A protein has these predicted regions:
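Internal amphipathic alpha-helical repeat/solenoid segments
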Residues: 31-39
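Divalent-cation-assisted or electrostatically stabilized phosphate/pyrophosphate-binding catalytic cores
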Residues: 128-138, 186-219
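Short, highly charged low-complexity linear segments
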Residues: 109-121, 201-213, 228-241
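C-terminal domain/tail detector
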Residues: 2-29, 47, 54-87, 217-244
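All-alpha helical catalytic cores of prenyl diphosphate-utilizing isoprenoid enzymes
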Residues: 26, 43-53, 63-186
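Alpha-helical structural motif
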Residues: 14, 49, 96, 207-211
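Short, N-terminal intrinsically disordered low-complexity segments that are rich in Pro/Gly
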Residues: 7-8, 39-43
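Short basic/hydrophobic patches in alpha-helices and adjacent helix-turn junctions
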Residues: 171-174, 178-181, 196, 213-221
């Protein structure tokens, strides 16, 4: 389904230049994340989250021309390619990390955060370490995307903000996916935050409480996006389990 730059701006507060750049961009060839896609951005959290997070980076002071620099975007797209290969179990986590790190050679803007991210992602189970991670490993499963920050000229405050708002934004998208996919994930033994939080109505309520707290944090940087996510909560209520 098509989503327009105007929708991004009107409903989620995304800067129009950023929204238009991604909406109008041609899906990269030979890239597993966009494989078979006619549109660069469609209605799926994995796609929508890209312009939304880049808008947050713009809001914390990263210029648009740096964020949308072609070399940087090509790196981000390659990162997504290897991330989805790992998600599909076509490559190991170590192969994914090694390849992404090789892509970053000569590009690293902050070695301290880069090395800290390497140590964090090298864990067999992603538990909080340094500035990275939340207490629920299933909500850390997309954190390889944070390597995009290593390719950008962030100062110390911007690093802290970029990480803080990442952990408010992307786990919220994962919570949406996990609530919708709960029964399927449980049957197939996949990661799911509701399974971590105890399942049943109690687990559902704990999951929603996390979601609401994330929306409060997002409100600090983008009130319109926070309202959009809050409004989406009603759609998630249909997934509340009737019994444990």
């Amino acid at each position: 389904m098509f989503i327009s730059a105007n929708q991004f701006e009107r409903e989620m507060g995304v800067n129009k230049t950023i929204g238009k750049f991604f909406v109008d961009r041609k899906p990269p060839e030979n890239n597993s994340f966009w494989k078979g896609r006619l549109l660069y951005i469609s209605f799926g959290n994995g796609f929508v989250s890209i312009p939304v997070y880049y808008d947050i980076l713009f809001r914390i002071g990263i210029p648009v021309e740096i964020l949308l620099n072609e070399d940087h975007i090509l790196f981000m797209e390659q990162l997504m390619h290897y991330a989805i290969l790992h998600e599909k179990r076509e490559i190991s986590m170590q192969e994914e990390l090694n390849t992404i790190c090789s892509l970053l050679k000569g590009r690293i803007q902050n070695s301290k955060y880069y090395e800290a991210l390497n140590l964090y992602l090298d864990q067999p189970v992603l538990k909080p370490m340094g500035p990275f991670g939340v207490p629920f490993p299933s909500l850390n499963r997309a954190d390889v995307f944070l390597y995009v920050l290593c390719d950008l000229p962030l100062n110390e405050m911007q690093w802290q903000q970029a990480i803080r708002f990442w952990y408010a934004l992307h786990p919220s998208y994962l919570i949406m996916d996990d609530l919708r996919d709960y029964a399927k994930d449980k049957e197939e033994g996949e990661e799911n935050v509701m399974i971590e939080l105890g399942e049943g109505t109690e687990g559902f309520e704990k999951t929603l409480e996390l979601y609401r707290k994330n929306c409060e944090t997002i409100h600090e940087i983008n009130p319109l996006l926070a309202q959009f996510l809050t409004n989406s909560e009603e759609d998630l209520m249909v997934f509340v389990p009737l019994k444990a």
